Design a protein with these regions (language model features):
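Phosphate-binding beta-alpha-beta segment of Rossmann-like dinucleotide-binding domains, i.e.
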Residues: 1-36
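Rossmann-like dinucleotide-binding domain for NAD(H)/NADP(H)
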Residues: 114-116, 120-199
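Short, cationic motifs built from Arg/Lys/His that form the positively charged side of catalytic pockets
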Residues: 2-6, 52, 107, 112, ...
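Oxidoreductase and adenylate-handling cofactor-binding alpha/beta cores
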Residues: 1-9, 35, 52-58, 190-195
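Conserved functional loop/turn residues at catalytic and ligand-binding sites
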Residues: 15, 36, 41, 87, ...
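Rossmann-like dinucleotide/phosphate-binding beta-alpha-beta segment
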Residues: 23-113
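Short clusters of hydrophobic/aromatic residues that line enzyme substrate/ligand-binding pockets
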Residues: 16, 102-103, 153, 159
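Short, flexible loop segments at the rims of nucleotide/cofactor-binding pockets, characterized by
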Residues: 16-17, 67-72, 94-97, 121, ...
Length: 199
């Protein structure tokens, strides 16, 4: 996404007007084809992400922190393999005794220096100071977060000390918040209330 910001600025600042070629090649990016997309938590959401990554040609591997049995269609890996092989690692797991603090300094140290880390699960799965250290020391390439340990973000959040801000993208817990998703949630809650009171 940071690349999109670069290209948008490039065009809107008038620099594209002066290009000699129809395409701007100076800022590179890569396809998902041939990359390994690791998923921590292959539940309903993780499986949808796996399906999409697979459609774009990525090899998908996953790790189940709870030790759940293998999911058909995708390669189950141990945690070390997930960390070492993933070009992109996305978290979709719930917070529980198996996942709290799982992504710590030791875990980030095992990842590729070119890896992108995404947390779309729960904030406390990540030791935030360890992620900041991994970004600042180049142990991973970039991170995208939709969840934090404390929400809204604290004024003294360690994420504010990331040296290269372009390597970290944070959204305010909105991955779930599409209008349609909220409408579905309200219908589910209404149905559960009716069931409880036998209405």
């Amino acid at each position: 996404l940071e690349g999109l910001r670069y290209y948008d600025d490039y065009v809107k600042e008038g620099r594209y007007v002066n290009d000699r070629e129809f395409t701007h090649f100076s800022h590179t990016f890569h396809e998902l084809q041939g990359m390994t997309w690791g998923i921590l938590g292959l539940g309903a959401i993780g499986r949808r992400v796996a399906d999409i990554a697979g459609m774009f040609g990525a090899k998908v591997i996953y790790y189940s922190a709870s030790g759940a049995s293998a999911q058909e269609g995708y390669c189950q890996a141990d945690f070390d393999t997930l960390l070492k092989e993933s070009d992109i690692l996305s978290v979709h797991a719930p917070l529980n005794q198996y996942t709290e603090g799982l992504m710590d300094q030791k875990a980030f140290h095992k990842m590729k220096s070119s890896a992108i880390f995404l947390n779309l699960g729960r904030g406390p799965i990540v030791r935030e100071a360890d992620l900041v250290k991994a970004l600042n020391e180049g142990e991973i390439q970039a991170a995208g977060l939709d969840v934090l340990s404390g929400e809204p973000m604290a004024a003294d959040s360690p994420f504010l000390s990331v040296k290269d801000k372009s390597r970290l993208l944070i959204t305010p817990h909105v991955a779930w918040a599409a209008v349609e998703a909220r409408q579905r949630l309200m219908k589910i809650i209404a149905g559960q209330i009716k069931d409880f009171f036998k209405l």
